Regions:
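C-terminal subdomains that position terminal phosphate/3'-OH groups for nucleotidyl transfer/ligation
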Residues: 1-138
Length: 138
């Protein structure tokens, strides 16, 4: 629906992407506190929140509007706080250091090197999220 409406209304690409993101993830964002670290990281990656943090803000605002629409809704949208805190944890991982440690001085083919680095960075981010979830308050 978001895709068809965006095409019909000729909305800017950024708006179309935000609508697509909200349509795909709004139910998951509402229950973000219950997500496992892998799903949480997938959400951060899907929102492209590391490169474009504004997209996460747009997603959270859309989700908050949906959640706060009933008259008896709470004044605070806790999933937004939780997801923003998770993003801080993910950003706290030094991807450059992880990449250097993952490859060392090994001479790997470019594709294998990129795959090794991507897997190591994901593992480090997951470890950071696991540690955070053990200590984070709901």
């Amino acid at each position: 629906l978001a895709e068809r409406m965006s095409a019909r209304l000729k909305v800017p690409v950024e708006c179309r992407d935000a609508a697509r993101l909200a349509a795909r993830w709004h139910r998951i964002v509402a229950g973000v506190q219950a997500l496992r670290p892998a799903a949480l990281l997938d959400l951060v990656n899907a929102a492209d929140a590391l490169r474009r943090p504004g997209r996460l803000g747009i997603l959270l605002h859309a989700c908050e509007c949906v959640a706060m629409s009933p008259p008896d809704a709470p004044d605070d949208f806790a999933p937004a706080r939780h997801l923003r805190a998770a993003l801080v944890v993910v950003k706290g991982v030094d991807a450059g250091a992880v990449a250097r440690a993952a490859t060392g001085k090994a001479k790997l083919p470019a594709a294998e090197r990129a795959d090794t680095i991507a897997k190591a960075i994901r593992a480090a981010r997951l470890a950071a999220l696991r540690a955070w979830k053990r200590t984070a308050r709901p």
